[in-house]
């Protein structure tokens, strides 16, 4: 009888210990995921702010008479087109204007000039309309589904956008959520 009571106590204590460890581990994973997500948010916001600063430099050069506005815009677009971030250089930025026209996209140059007002993801999310709302609010994050660089895979993406007022440009970048969770 004592042996059975001792065995039962050990089993109960073991189960409690395992339960505690599992809860602790889940809490640590959730904290890590939150930290990683905060890091991604900070990364994409920082990249956009860097791009806006570069665009601002070209704008100032046009205002000073060093470049025409068109020359400044073309140079700014080409610099932003070449900008990459992330270890694998998968991070890039694109520019829409406030009339919803694609100004520059390094992966989809054939779509430049197209109006994207009605661009909608598979869940009915109006991608560019939401991006514009965030940019109009001083900058912000959006989530939507978009085709990956392979041209086939559609995956959820988290993006950050800000507006460059003098040229009515909205600069955006984002990361695919599944790429972020793979790292976690």
Please report, for each region that a protein language model flagged, where it lies by residue.
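Short N-terminal helix-loop-first-beta-strand/juxtamembrane motif that initiates sensory/input modules
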Residues: 42, 81-102, 139-141
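A short beta-strand signature within small-molecule sensing/ligand-binding domains used
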Residues: 91, 128, 151-162
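Extreme N-terminal signal-anchor transmembrane helix of membrane signaling/transducer proteins, especially
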Residues: 1-24
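Membrane-interface helix-start motif
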Residues: 29, 36, 178-184
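Short, hydrophobic beta-strand elements of compact beta-sandwich sensory domains
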Residues: 156-183
